[in-house]
Structures are given as C-alpha cells and as structure tokens.
Amino acid sequence: MLSLKLPRLFRIDQVPQVFHEQGILFGYRHPQSSATACILSLFQMTNETLNIWTHLLPFWFFVWRFMTALYVTDIQNDSYSWPMLVYMCTSCVYPLASSCAHTFSSMSKNARHICYFLDYGAVNLFSLGSAIAYSAYTFPDALVCSTFHECYVALAVLNTILSTGLSCYSRFLELQKPRLCKLLRVLAFAYPYTWDSLPIFYRLFLFPGESSRNEAMLYHQKHMGMTLLASFFYSAHLPERLAPGRFDYIGHSHQLFHVCVILATHLQMEAILLDKTLRREWLLATSRPFSFPQIAAAMLLCIIFSLSNIIYFSAALYRIPEPELHEKET
C-alpha cells in the first residue's frame, strides 16, 4: 500500500535566518524542501499552512465570480463591462500567486525570494486592475473626463512598475536592515493603493452629497476599513510578537492579514459592481468606455515591466555573495 510520509518540521534555531519570521518559533519546513514536500505540506500543520489556504480557497471563489460574470456578459459588444472583467481576472491572480509563493518558498533561499518577487508582481497587477475599474465606474461626477481622470490609469501603470521594483529591492535589506526593509515594502504597497483610492477619497470627503445618494459608498468605506486593518496586521506582527510561540500555527498576523485582504477584495468587488450598475446610464452618456487597445496596453506594460523587474532582481540574487544577502551584519 502506497503511503506518503509528511515532511519533518523544524524549530527557528534549526533553519537559516532568511527563513525566520518574527514571533514564530516552531513549524518551519526544511529550507531545501523538494517541490513534492512543499505540496505535501499543504496537508500538514506548519506555520505556513493557513497562509496558503487563506488565499487558495478564496482563489476558487473569485474564479467562480469571474466565470459567472463572463457567462452573463456579451464580451464582444459590451465594452462597458470590460474593465470589470479585467479587475475580476486580476482578483483571481493575486491569491493564486500568494498561495504558490507560500507553498514553494521553502525550496531554497533564492527560491524563497523569487517566489515573493512573483507574489509582489501579482499584487501590483491587481492594483492596476483596481485602478482600471475605478476609472471606469467610481470616479466622482465632477472629475469624469477631467485631466486627472485622463492621466489616472497611465500613472497607475507607472506606480505598479515602481512598486514591484521597490518591493523586490526591499528583500535584499531583509536581514541587514529589517526596519528599513519593512518600511520600504509597506511604502511600496501603500502608495499605489493611495493613488488608486483617490477617486473614493474625493467622493467621501469632497462630494459627500453625491456619496450619500449612492449605496456603493458603504461598501467602499468597509473596504477601506478592512484594508487599514490588513495593513495593521502586516506591519505590527501582532499577536505573535507579544507571545512568541503561541500563535505559530493558528492566529498569527500574516494569516489575519490574508483574511483581511480577501474580505477587503470582496467588499471592493461589491462596491465596484454597484457603481457599475447604478451609474451605467450616466457614465455611458457622459464618458467614453475604455477601448480594448487601451486596456490591453495598460495590462501588457504592467506585466512586461514587472516581469523585467522580477527577472532583474532574481538574477541579482545569484550575483551577490551569499553572506551579504543571507547573513545579518554583526
């Protein structure tokens, strides 16, 4: 009878420092795991297991939402719905990339970095998908067709490219300058999100009368609140920082961060769908829908330059002497 032996787990002092997580003492996988061992760890309680499943299960939920939208949309003729489909597609990409990164990050030191480079690229692709949907459906009435509106997606593309580069670069500082590393990585994700959210800020704070007439704004507010909560968990490393070893398997900050991010995406999707439906007639009469070349160009530029960043920093891993990258300065 065929039987599979689950991989052995290790303590924090048994794995290289590049694999250490603040406040997590047990449940580490072998730092040179095979791909098979990584996949088997999906069904073993490690300190990464729930990190994987908290994005892998929602991935299938978002795929279902995307496929349902495809089924009811006349893709060829309904150009008004194209930005929504692009957004929903990118909402499937980032949870899958995150799950894969957490699954295979224990194959080697360099594999760990490359996995997260790809994860950062996927997050930024989702950021661009959000910007495209916001541009199409959520802009305040007073700013539709303004210069800001015309430049909004182009600058969102630039933001994703810079953000991918900055977040990848931050990994090279992870051991030598951990505080700077965390600061740069938070900044890398915060400023594209802030740019993407400017239309929502306008509607909330500068055009409150318009906001009160649109029920989508309640979902936008909930989305922002959940995103702030996700940012807190990502930055603070709570609760495990207060009780090292107590939350190694269940309840540590990265798991809570994943849950908050997924809930934020769900709320954001509901808000955009409501804006798309409630404002359809006005937007079609007032603004021009995105053309296919515009959407394709934005997505391709993001993908090409983000992949270029990932390839550049991945190659740099093999050019930098190992002690400089993987050992802490003394």
Swiss-Prot record:
TM region(s), chain numbering: 52-72, 82-101, 114-134, 142-162, 187-207, 254-274, 295-315
Descriptive protein name: Membrane progestin receptor gamma
One matching Pfam family: HlyIII
Function: Plasma membrane progesterone (P4) receptor coupled to G proteins. Seems to act through a G(i) mediated pathway. May be involved in oocyte maturation.
GO BP annotations listed: oogenesis
Main subcellular location: membrane
Location relative to the cell: Cell membrane
Note: Non-classical progesterone receptors involved in extranuclear signaling are classified in 2 groups: the class II progestin and adipoQ receptor (PAQR) family (also called mPRs) (PAQR5, PAQR6, PAQR7, PAQR8 and PAQR9) and the b5-like heme/steroid-binding protein family (also called MAPRs) (PGRMC1, PGRMC2, NENF and CYB5D2).
Keyword set, alphabetical order: Cell membrane, Developmental protein, Differentiation, Lipid-binding, Membrane, Oogenesis, Receptor, Steroid-binding, Transmembrane, Transmembrane helix
Assigned GO CC terms: plasma membrane
Presence of keyword Transmembrane helix: yes
Family listed: Belongs to the ADIPOR family.
Side of membrane Cytoplasmic, spans: 1-51, 102-113, 163-186, 275-294
GO molecular function: steroid binding
Protein origin, superkingdom: Eukaryota
